[in-house]
């Protein structure tokens, strides 16, 4: 029983490593290409620096977004709850808006009747 669990865990681990290595492959090829260009051309060093900076910034933004997701979800839930409470508090006591005869409003480049 224990050996089958270990085998399953190892199989899942190897599968996860294989997926991670495959997903990282294109960036390695791009980096290798930029390194070859930088050796041949001095302007390639600047391109390499831009690429590494962009890669670093994208990783930081992704980590920040992952860290903020739970907080944003809780804030959104709180806002929805407040909105629902306000709607319930207003209830049927609010009378529908009465429109005057011949009244027109200017909305988005056209006149609409009130």
Swiss-Prot record:
Its main location: secreted. GO terms for cellular component: extracellular space. It comes from the Eukaryota. One of its GO terms (molecular function) is hormone activity. InterPro entries: Somatostatin, Somatostatin/Cortistatin_C. Keywords: Cleavage on pair of basic residues, Disulfide bond, Hormone, Secreted, Signal. It is found in: Secreted. Disulfide bonds join 103-114. GO terms for biological process: regulation of cell migration. Residues 1-24 form the signal peptide. Residues 25-88 form a propeptide. Belongs to the somatostatin family. Somatostatin inhibits the release of somatotropin. This is Somatostatin-1A. It comes from Carassius auratus.
């Amino acid at each position: 029983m224990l050996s089958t669990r270990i085998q399953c865990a190892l199989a899942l681990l190897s599968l996860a490593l294989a997926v991670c290595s495959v997903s990282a492959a294109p960036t390695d090829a791009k980096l290798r290409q930029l390194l070859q260009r930088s050796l041949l051309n001095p302007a390639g060093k600047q391109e390499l620096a831009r690429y590494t900076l962009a890669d670093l910034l994208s990783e930081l933004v992704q980590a920040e977004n992952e860290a903020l997701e739970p907080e944003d979800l809780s804030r959104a839930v709180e806002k929805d709850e407040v909105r629902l409470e306000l709607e319930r508090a207003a209830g049927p006591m609010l009378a529908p808006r009465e429109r005057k005869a011949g009244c027109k409003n200017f909305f988005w480049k056209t006149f609409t009747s009130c």
